[in-house]
Amino acid sequence: KIAIPLEEGILCSHFGHCQQFAIIDADGKNITGLTLLTPPPHEPGLLPGWLAEKGVTDVIAGGMGQRAINLFNERKINVFVGAPIKPPKDLASDLLNDTLSAGANYCDH
């Protein structure tokens, strides 16, 4: 499952203060579903655990603090930051097809 923070339906550049998250299900390189979830009220360190509970394995973000990146990595969730401002299905498709132009890839493997 891929999580993407959204504002006005596209990638939100400020991870911790987004309006919604797109949770995208995929099978291989194919998107099989998209669910929109409203995050709990912002608290530092809360979102990595909340998304882990949803079964998320990858996060695509515009910008994210190092503490959040570390918390995701502790939960074995891959983080891709510096992604372009695009609709969530486009970003997920780019990730699944290894064409995502992110500035950095923070993963534990």
Predicted regions and their residues:
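Compact, glycine-rich, soluble single-domain proteins
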Residues: 33-54
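C-terminal structural segments of small proteins and small subunits
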Residues: 66-109
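Short acidic active-site motifs
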Residues: 10, 46-47, 87-90
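Conserved SAM-binding loop
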Residues: 60-61
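Short Gly/Pro-enriched loop/turn and capping motifs at secondary-structure junctions
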Residues: 42, 64-67
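Short acidic/polar active-site loop segments enriched in Thr and Asp
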Residues: 57
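N-terminal first-folded block
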Residues: 1-39
